[in-house]
Amino acid sequence: MKNKIVSSAPSIGISFGAGGARGIAHLLMIEALDDLGLKPSIISGSSIGAVVGAFYAAGFSAKEMREILNQLINPKSDSVFDFLLKSDIVKLFTMFDPQFIKSGFIKGEKFQSYMKSHLPVSRFEELKIPLKIVATDYWKKEEVIFDKGDLINPIKASYSLPGLFTPVKIKNRILIDGGAVNPLPYDLLKNDCHITIAIDVTAVKMQSENEIPPTFDSVFTTYQTMQNSIINERLKFLKPDIYIRPEIYDVRVFDFVKADLIFKQAQPAKEELKRKLEVLLNKS
């Protein structure tokens, strides 16, 4: 086993990207840092990355977050997350307070309550690690960055997929999913650390490329294609010090029940992150 990196190493910033269930892979990237005895000095997140980033910034280890995930997808008793045992998207809607209204199918108040009950903090200032969360101003079509004040509502805004979740109103701004403008917000880290890490969990090709996709799949895949384009264009002009993209196949936006498959497929990316970090830190 390799020696842990000394605490005098340069400061690290890590960005957790959007990607739905594939965001489970973020936990392996946190494990990579844990294995090396490292903690970031700054975190940024968009959509599912904002959720993971909040728990990490609040002090949860990768192991603790895995335990929470296991409770959610393998509940021993009935819970609001029982939908995860089913593939039927209608069950998912039920869990998230479905309301067939013009602003979106899902209110998301149950999940918001879950966040409030499990996160030990409710404000950015109470986090152990500084965190920046990205959402999108629907009407102004611009990025909104949160790093102070209330924590829970910005998280909800950041994962509010347009047309599915109802938008979130914060200070007279109507906000939707951060992935619409910045699905991998590593650019927010560059002035706050020596080494920037970007974890991209946007979709790669599906195996069933010749099939006509179901309605929801086609909508989400189109949205993810847009996210891929945003990230690829940004990488041309501003590169993080370490860019990691786990090769996760056949995992759709709400395939949280495929956690074991995601962990298996993302394992090589975890080892890649460790190797790249060791190289950079040993040069310092």
Spans of features found by a protein language model:
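Patatin-like phospholipase
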Residues: 1-46, 54-284
